[in-house]
């Protein structure tokens, strides 16, 4: 079998394999479509048999390989779920959709990276000739060099670390030289040479045509050899191969070199081929495509994209045609497109393998496009026109992000001839008569406009974990659905409940296919999540009072019968009811209502028993019909009807052995409805919650949110090392902002040792007591409540307070508004009215006996400048979603508090934690990481300010007038208040030098000869230095004098005692003493 037959055989085999893959893919689509139809019909499908997105994506990868893009498969899966009856084409799985809709169209994004024009830097090249202009700029990212070449022959190399300038135009990576071109010559120059050798360079000539552009082909596998591509005015592309032997770079250093050496171009290995019918304006080598590109003003052969081998033969090449040719082009690797621009003022986007038609166009320039560069990291394309107008484009959304103009200089003198983007420093560099540098910055940092997802304040935010999408509702009654990973808007619904009817709450069912909305007028609607179509509704009652039946909370309940929907609703008046939706009825009806127990609990009854109704229902519901069993009590407290006692928040908990509803009221009470124990009881009641005080805030006791915390047996079996909290403690110090000081640490002590010991104890305990999987018993649930006074409290079902915490933020005692936890209760999130997010670790705390020391706050950060109404934790992505009344829904990294963006921005999300730490424009506080001090850490006292002996203070303390003021001490009692230590003080900085009378002693030698000798004044006479215990003698003398009143001796006469009598009295009261004067003042020779 020859090569041609083998090639045909391999091609036929690949076609057969692809056809077999298509058959398997069609079977997968048929199976998934049939299952989605059954789910829409209400047929129960076991979880292990259900085909969710993860299973579907894994199956597609097994069929077609790992090259299938995640985003394309997700779009195909979403289309399949929204309309299983629609027709599907296999090419859609590869991203080729036939729709004309542009889902990327949205408003301008203030978070995008743009160029900060106001901080433009300008470098004037010293020594440049008059009216000289920079014709070429090349960036060498490996060495962080910037190379420029002027029209009149000045070549300059700029180094970010060195201000000295060296000359050059493009860089030969293997030879470590700079190559430049003139009209008829090639110049190779050693920019690292020193002294007179710096002017040594090689000239290669002659050339057949005028050289217009040059680039170097990187050859990492070749040593001491480089390939140079040249474009000329004849439409030829030349390739020159240069090596170290060609320039004699290996010769001995003793050999004298001339300053300029002329080399014959015929001695170099070179090939050329005519690819254009006009000037070659730009030539570049693209390593990602392993080919070179050259553009020309030729309208037929405008752009040629081919491998280097095509220069050596006459085989056809890939040609891209465009009117009036192309002046410049660039390649974007992530988007895999080539962008061209020329005199027709249109930027065209081309797929490298499709030369017949561009895949997109960018229109906006009013003059000819002269330069194009790309910002690969941010997916930006920067284009420059002949009028010095810059436009920054988003290559993903095909939209313009920024337009700015270089207004300095005249149109001729200051024309910009070259432009390059420095990815190392995030800077756009242009060359004209000067070099201008535009630093890249976040647009959100350079604007005063706050990010907004909706035009009005956000009322509801929900996360659909099955579709990985986010639903947001604003007070203007606009529903929007967003893609979590990209931030793109999927669809929106305007006025879902009618014109000017505000939506106040919403909920998503367990399967993720439906969501319900509730309005302030009491109406409820059920929608299809995938398509946004209305399915069922409950109209407003005729006798309803305005806003009395407004809905505050909605919960989907597990239906007892298939093909029906049950919704638990909380009204503004405190009523809790169940709304039912049947398959054959488009209207929703109220089938169950909970009686009001507040009138009985407020009179001191801590528990009210329930009577289950014996009435049988045609359709079973999760909660039975109940009646309150009222018992008359003799003790009744005075109840003020002015106090608001309505239910403000509720939560539902239904699992095996539990059927509970927890309620938090506006006056601070927590009520628990237990339908298994047939009782409703008071969990918590603040003191004076029923009394009114006009000087106090009536909302001070209000409970803003309440939630059950329960860890299922499956979660108990999981390892605690998978917890997000442990990863936060371990990885938070590795965050980029920690090294830059963007975080504020409360305690510097390391908790690694304590954490390791705790994990080790858990592992050793698990080894000693192996528990079978089937015998793991779940612990009873806990209650957590968020209070108006800023406290976070945790309760048992019996009403025992096990944790009362005031979260640490910049300002304490801030009202908490929202709570959220993950599926296994490892992390607890809370939001407050000042826009802070509090992240707590509760993984160890949930294990009995619920040690409150294991409840730890890990992180807090300012997410909004206004109140947070909802905080959501996406555990599979370790992200936090926050919604605020400022109209924005923002996304954060949970492990570090890094800001990722907001829904509604023009650019897609980059959820990977980068080193660029940014904040929204309305937030200027860095995240605060909370670290506990380890109990194993020894506290060592540090003395930062040493004390010195203050002679002036000693003189005051040693005066004789202070010797007779204190009462005497008992014998053998030691006086600890030493005056010497009282004479110590902090060092004072002298504003004048000490007096020196001798600056040098020649006889002492040169080592210490320059040390000055200072005069030290003589110490105070030792005669009056006090002794330890002298306080006793001084006070004893005073006692002797007071006894001589019968002799009528005045106190003024006491100093007239003789010296002998004074010494005798001192000897009589002598106690053990120590003379410290010799220690403090050594004797000085006279």
Curated annotation (Swiss-Prot):
<dbReference type="InterPro" id="IPR001680">
    <property type="entry name" value="WD40_rpt"/>
</dbReference>
<dbReference type="InterPro" id="IPR051242">
    <property type="entry name" value="WD-EF-hand_domain"/>
</dbReference>
<feature type="repeat" description="WD 6">
    <location>
        <begin position="453"/>
        <end position="492"/>
    </location>
</feature>
<feature type="repeat" description="WD 11">
    <location>
        <begin position="809"/>
        <end position="850"/>
    </location>
</feature>
<dbReference type="Pfam" id="PF00400">
    <property type="entry name" value="WD40"/>
</dbReference>
<feature type="repeat" description="WD 1">
    <location>
        <begin position="129"/>
        <end position="168"/>
    </location>
</feature>
<dbReference type="InterPro" id="IPR015943">
    <property type="entry name" value="WD40/YVTN_repeat-like_dom_sf"/>
</dbReference>
<feature type="repeat" description="WD 10">
    <location>
        <begin position="765"/>
        <end position="806"/>
    </location>
</feature>
<keyword id="KW-0853">WD repeat</keyword>
<feature type="repeat" description="WD 3">
    <location>
        <begin position="321"/>
        <end position="360"/>
    </location>
</feature>
<feature type="repeat" description="WD 9">
    <location>
        <begin position="642"/>
        <end position="683"/>
    </location>
</feature>
<feature type="repeat" description="WD 2">
    <location>
        <begin position="170"/>
        <end position="199"/>
    </location>
</feature>
<feature type="region of interest" description="Disordered">
    <location>
        <begin position="724"/>
        <end position="749"/>
    </location>
</feature>
<feature type="region of interest" description="Disordered">
    <location>
        <begin position="1047"/>
        <end position="1069"/>
    </location>
</feature>
<feature type="compositionally biased region" description="Basic and acidic residues">
    <location>
        <begin position="1049"/>
        <end position="1062"/>
    </location>
</feature>
<feature type="repeat" description="WD 12">
    <location>
        <begin position="863"/>
        <end position="902"/>
    </location>
</feature>
<feature type="repeat" description="WD 8">
    <location>
        <begin position="560"/>
        <end position="602"/>
    </location>
</feature>
<feature type="compositionally biased region" description="Low complexity">
    <location>
        <begin position="732"/>
        <end position="744"/>
    </location>
</feature>
<protein>
    <recommendedName>
        <fullName>WD repeat-containing protein 64</fullName>
    </recommendedName>
</protein>
<dbReference type="InterPro" id="IPR036322">
    <property type="entry name" value="WD40_repeat_dom_sf"/>
</dbReference>
<feature type="repeat" description="WD 7">
    <location>
        <begin position="498"/>
        <end position="537"/>
    </location>
</feature>
<feature type="repeat" description="WD 5">
    <location>
        <begin position="411"/>
        <end position="448"/>
    </location>
</feature>
<feature type="repeat" description="WD 4">
    <location>
        <begin position="364"/>
        <end position="403"/>
    </location>
</feature>
<keyword id="KW-0677">Repeat</keyword>
